[in-house]
Amino acid sequence: MKTLKSYYKLSGILLSSLFLTMSCTKDFTELNTNPAGVTDEEAMGDFALVASFLAQGQRAILSENVGEYQVSNNLTSDAYGGYFGAEAPFVGNANNLTYSLVPGWYSSLWVDRYIRAMNPLFRVELMTRNDEKMKDIFAFAKILKVSAMHRTSDKVGPIIYSKYNAPDESDQIHYDNQEDAYKNFFKDLDTATTILKTYKGKEVSAAMKKSDLAYTSNNYDRWLRIANTLRLRLALRVAFKDAALAKTEGEKALNPENGGLLESTADNCFIKLSTDHPLNIITTTWSDTRMHASIESFLGGYKDPRMEKLFEKATDPAVKGQYKGIRTGIDIDAKSRYDNYSKLLPLPNKMQLMVASESWFLKAEAALRGWSNAGDAKSNYENGIDRSFEMYGLSAAATAYKNNSSDKPMPYIDPKAIKAGQNDINAGSPFLSTITIAWNEADSKDRKLERIITQKWISMFPDGDEAWAEYRRSGYPILFPVVVNYSNNTIPTNPGIRRMPYPEREYNSNSAAVNEAVKMLGGPDNGGTRLWWDSTNKKL
C-alpha cells in the first residue's frame, strides 16, 4: 500500500492509467529539473502530455470518479450543505450523515485531491514555468490548482500546499496553516492574472485549445474572469476573520483593470467529463441520493420554478406528486423507506465549476461591505437571480420572483419517519428560515446578507463544497440540523459539523507534520473544530 506521504512527491503514482509510457523517478532534484522523467521536446511535442495532465487536474477538482465523488462530496458537503440526503443506512446508519465519521470516506477526499489534482497540476507548473511560449498554460495550471486546493482546505483546514514536493531532512512534508494557505492562494492568483492580462486579445494557443475542457472561445478572457471571481470568493470567505485581508483581495478582484468578473451565462464554467456525471450514477444506478429536506423547504416555500428543473416529483404513495426531500442525520432502517422521494433530474456530462450568478451575489455582499467597485447591492442581488433563472431557461419568470415579498421557506413534514413527527420542522422553529425574496432596503445588513447568501446557495446547486463552506462561514442559509448525532459529543448538533478529519494513513507516514497541522487547528482533529476562517462573530 502506498503511504499518503508519497502522494506529496512527484513519483507518478496512480497516473499510470493515463501515462503508461511515462518514466518516473523518486529523485527530488531530478524531478524539479526534469519533471515526469521526459525531455522538453517529449513533454511539449503536440502538447498531448500537458493537455492530459491538465484534463486530469480539471476533472479532479470535484472528482469525476463516482466512488470518490460519493464519499468525498455527496456524503459530506452535498449533505452538510443542504442539497442532498441519503436514503440508505450506510454502515448501520452510523456514518458521516449521523456524525459517526467513516475514516475510509474522508481518506478518499484527501488522497483524491493530491493524486488526481495537485500532482498533475504541479507537474504542469514545473514543465512550463521557464517556457515563455507556455506562460498561458502555467497561469491556467495555477488557477486550477487554487480551485482544487481551496476546496480541500475548506474541508480540513491546514493543507500541504506551498511545501508540496519539498520534504524536510526527516522526509516529512509539512503543512501550511489555513491563513498561510489562503495567502498562498492569493499569490498564485496574482501570478495567474498578471500573466493572463498580457494575453487579452491574443489568439488562443494550440496548447490552450487542447487543454481547456470548459471553453471553446474567449478562453483567456474567461479564465481571467474565473481567477478574479475565485479571488472574490476567497476574499469573502475570510471576511469575518481578517477584514483587512478580505478587503484588499476583494477590491483587487473588483478592480476592472484586472480583467473583470464572470458576468453572463456565456461565462459559466462547466468542465467536460470523460464519463457520465457522478450524481447521475449515484441517483439512478445506485439509488443512493435524493433531494435534501432543506432545499425542498426553500424552493417549495418560494414556489421557485427552478424546482422542476432540478428534481423529479416523488412517487412514494405517502407523498406522491410532491417534491419531497430527506433530512440529513435521521433514523433510517432500510433504503426502501425513502427510495421513492424526489430524485435529481439527469445532469449533462460536465461538472459545474463556477457560474456567473455566484459572481453577482459575491458582488452584492462586497457592496454591502462597502468595497470599492462593488456597485449597488440590490442591483447585484437581482442580477444574480436573473443569471440563475436565465441558466435554466426561466428568464420570463425572474421579475415576478424578484418582486415576491411574501413567500418564505415552508415547514417540512416527513410522513415516513420511523417515529412520527421526529423529522418535522414546524412553523416557528428556529431552524425554519423566515427570509423572503424581494430586496428590502430597510432591512439590517445581517438580514440583507441572509437574503444574498440564500439566493446564492440556490443558484450554486449542486456545488455542495461551496454550499457547506458558505453555511459555515456566514451561518446562511438556515439549514435543518441532524436528528441523530453519533459523534460522542465531538460535533455539536447545532451549528453542526465544521470540518473533516485527517486520514489515519497520514498519521502513520507523515506523523510529525500532521500533528503539527493539528496544533495549527487550535483544537482536536475531529468534526467539531472550527477552521481558521470560521469565526464565531458573523455580524456585519
Label each residue range with its predicted role.
Residues 69-73, 310-313, 396-397, 464-473:
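Short coil/turn segments at secondary-structure boundaries
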Residues 20, 66-67, 394:
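Intrinsically disordered or highly flexible coil/loop and linker segments, enriched in small
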Residues 1, 24-27, 57, 146, ...:
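Terminal processing/anchoring signals of secreted or surface-associated proteins
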Residues 33-35, 340-341, 428-433:
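Short acidic (Asp/Glu) and glycine-rich catalytic loops that position anionic groups and cofactors
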Residues 401-540:
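C-terminal functional modules
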Residues 86-144, 148-397, 441-450, 455:
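Structured, solvent-exposed acidic/aromatic patches
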Residues 24-82, 104, 112, 127, ...:
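Membrane-proximal, proline-rich intrinsically disordered regions
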Residues 1-22:
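Sec-dependent bacterial lipoprotein signal peptides
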